[in-house]
Amino acid sequence: MAWDMCSQDSVWSDIECAALVGEDQPLCPDLPELDLSELDVNDLDTDSFLGGLKWCSDQSEIISNQYNNEPANIFEKIDEENEANLLAVLTETLDSLPVDEDGLPSFDALTDGAVTTDNEASPSSMPDGTPPPQEAEEPSLLKKLLLAPANTQLSYNECSGLSTQNHAANHTHRIRTNPAIVKTENSWSNKAKSICQQQKPQRRPCSELLKYLTTNDDPPHTKPTENRNSSRDKCASKKKSHTQPQSQHAQAKPTTLSLPLTPESPNDPKGSPFENKTIERTLSVELSGTAGLTPPTTPPHKANQDNPFKASPKLKPSCKTVVPPPTKRARYSECSGTQGSHSTKKGPEQSELYAQLSKSSGLSRGHEERKTKRPSLRLFGDHDYCQSLNSKTDILINISQELQDSRQLDFKDASCDWQGHICSSTDSGQCYLRETLEASKQVSPCSTRKQLQDQEIRAELNKHFGHPCQAVFDDKSDKTSELRDGDFSNEQFSKLPVFINSGLAMDGLFDDSEDESDKLSYPWDGTQPYSLFDVSPSCSSFNSPCRDSVSPPKSLFSQRPQRMRSRSRSFSRHRSCSRSPYSRSRSRSPGSRSSSRSCYYYESSHYRHRTHRNSPLYVRSRSRSPYSRRPRYDSYEAYEHERLKRDEYRKEHEKRESERAKQRERQKQKAIEERRVIYVGKIRPDTTRTELRDRFEVFGEIEECTVNLRDDGDSYGFITYRYTCDAFAALENGYTLRRSNETDFELYFCGRKQFFKSNYADLDTNSDDFDPASTKSKYDSLDFDSLLKEAQRSLRR
């Protein structure tokens, strides 16, 4: 049993009912219903029943494998007479009592659909006489039986295959449920079984069941041998001819039931809350060998699993007709529904994959259309993803440059009163300024808004603080500087190559404008900076005899540092001292035309270095360094206080160092007393402390190792172990560390006592007989007269 969907907005007729029953029987809407409330759940063989439950068409292969061991002719043993009698009984239940709505839940997650009216004409037949099937949506049998209350009585109707068209056309409101009951034969005991099912015609496809849509290459008009399993179809097709029902009925297999589930009743109005909320669940049930009819209380699988492959609910794929072959493997043929009085046949076969791809392709086309409408980005200069600027940007760049030129001409008019031609050019520049402003407003009012705001900010700054060039310098120096700017700024900077900074946008960097100085401007005056274009070949009329000289005049070297120093608010006297005398003499010489560019660039670099050293920023930074000058004190008391602090700190430092030395000495003395110090004598003169430590570390952990070298080659060392036992081990076994080219080590305990002599001369043996008075001279007891007589007596001798 497979899940099928219908793509056309036609009425689901009762063809499916006829296909499920397997016979062309007339519809009898006024027969009594069957009551199954007396059935016991324990009578149901749950193992065989649940084993026959299959949820989708991908399980059809498993279903077919369950009956591979059955005889080939097991379905041919069906008694045709018993089948006809049972079908006659089943035709007695049509359009009886509706299902209680309180026992059925409302499914909010389902998609909406159209409402079928009686204006829809019955579908026309195919050329071979076979009418195409209509749309069908069927809920699951298990879901219906689980959700219905225990005391709810189900109504049963029988559907006829020949009267379905008229029955569909006679509906005056939305098509309601047509319950049906189908009989099946037990393959082993020929025991008749009947299953209660309700068929609810639905017009809207359920998005949850789209993954069960499959296609088949079989045409809508199938062979009689394939139509013998039509009782298992959900969206069934009519019989190819009226002479085939007996042969198909004779070849019928154990019935597979389809039970649609819906909360609606035939008396519901069109505005019912369940009108736009439907569900389609179909359960394939094999009832062979079951003992009862009562379904299980729990489904074998989760009924509302999310379908990761479901397509859009708005997509309506074609209705599929399931025709199982004799091997019971599900095969499906695609048939197209018709509406009105004309028949329309689908061209290519459509499946869930086809619908999904169609939807994704539509989304991708919309995405590509949005991509094509994306504006071009403004990127930076020398990258491979750069895009060329459009014409509007070029127009705005030219307008901004012309505004810069007009501002410079206006400033020249204010600073240079004696130049009449500059005044006239200023007037024309102002007129052109108004024209360009109007043109810029017409071209792009949104993009020129920022430029106009910058002009207003500059005007306010110049109004309150004055022009930056007039901040420090006097009027005369400003006139000279601006005159030099006007003479060679345009001509010189046009000769320079275009320097592209990676951090600058592409606005204006690739233009061939004459005034390159306007490319980089200060925030409020629009003048060129010193950092990027500081030197260039120039033509000056002040210091050179010829106007077209290529040599660097002094105005060239003085202009940029002046502008830089004006920003740093230095004094005007730095201007004269910052000029290079060598460049001045070169520029005044008649032979300056033949000066080489290499010498010129050397002078330029040398000049820049000197300018940097003479700049106020450089001098200020040197003067503020802590090592450039001595500290100054306000008074002598402050100096004395600082000196006392330094002396106190020095004394504290010396005291700490002496304490550390005493601590180390005490530790050494303690190690000597603990017998942890070993004296190692007669070591090689080239022995290092690391080597001696590595060789004696085999006996234990060493805290300290020292080596003392002598000029006579008698070198020695001291090794302090952490533990006394390690020192004893080194003293006893240290001789084993001697190499073949070395003498035996002298190993002793303690520190420096081995250098003391053990035998001393006793100089104090007669100390007891010593009289301090005997050491006194004889002259000490004589007076002056005695001493005089003694002296005279010595002279006579």
UniProtKB/Swiss-Prot annotation:
Pfam families: RRM_1 (PF00076). Induction: Dramatically induced in brown adipose tissue and skeletal muscle by exposure of animals to cold. Up-regulated in brown adipose tissue of obese leptin-deficient (ob/ob) and leptin-unresponsive (db/db) mice. Leptin is required for normal basal and cold-stimulated expression in brown adipose tissue and hyperleptinemia rapidly up-regulates its expression. Induced in muscle by exercise. Oscillates diurnally in liver and skeletal muscle. The modification N6-acetyllysine is found at K77, K144, K183, K253, K270, K277, K320, K346, K412, K441, K450, K757, K778. The modification Phosphoserine is found at S538. Residues 578-598 have a biased composition (Low complexity). Residues 676-752 form the RRM domain. Residues 292-338 are annotated as: Interaction with PPARG. GO terms for biological process: adipose tissue development; cellular response to oxidative stress; circadian regulation of gene expression; energy homeostasis; gluconeogenesis; mitochondrion organization; negative regulation of neuron apoptotic process; negative regulation of smooth muscle cell proliferation. Residues 218-236 have a biased composition (Basic and acidic residues). One of its GO terms (molecular function) is nuclear receptor binding. The modification Phosphothreonine is found at T177. Residues 114-127, 243-259 have a biased composition (Polar residues). Homooligomer. Interacts with MYBBP1A; inhibits MYBBP1A transcriptional activation. Interacts with PRDM16, LPIN1 and PML. Interacts (via LXXLL motif) with RORA and RORC (via AF-2 motif); activates RORA and RORC transcriptional activation. Interacts with LRPPRC. Interacts with FOXO1. Interacts with NR5A2. Transcriptional coactivator for steroid receptors and nuclear receptors. Greatly increases the transcriptional activity of PPARG and thyroid hormone receptor on the uncoupling protein promoter. Can regulate key mitochondrial genes that contribute to the program of adaptive thermogenesis. Plays an essential role in metabolic reprogramming in response to dietary availability through coordination of the expression of a wide array of genes involved in glucose and fatty acid metabolism. This is Peroxisome proliferator-activated receptor gamma coactivator 1-alpha. It comes from Mus musculus.
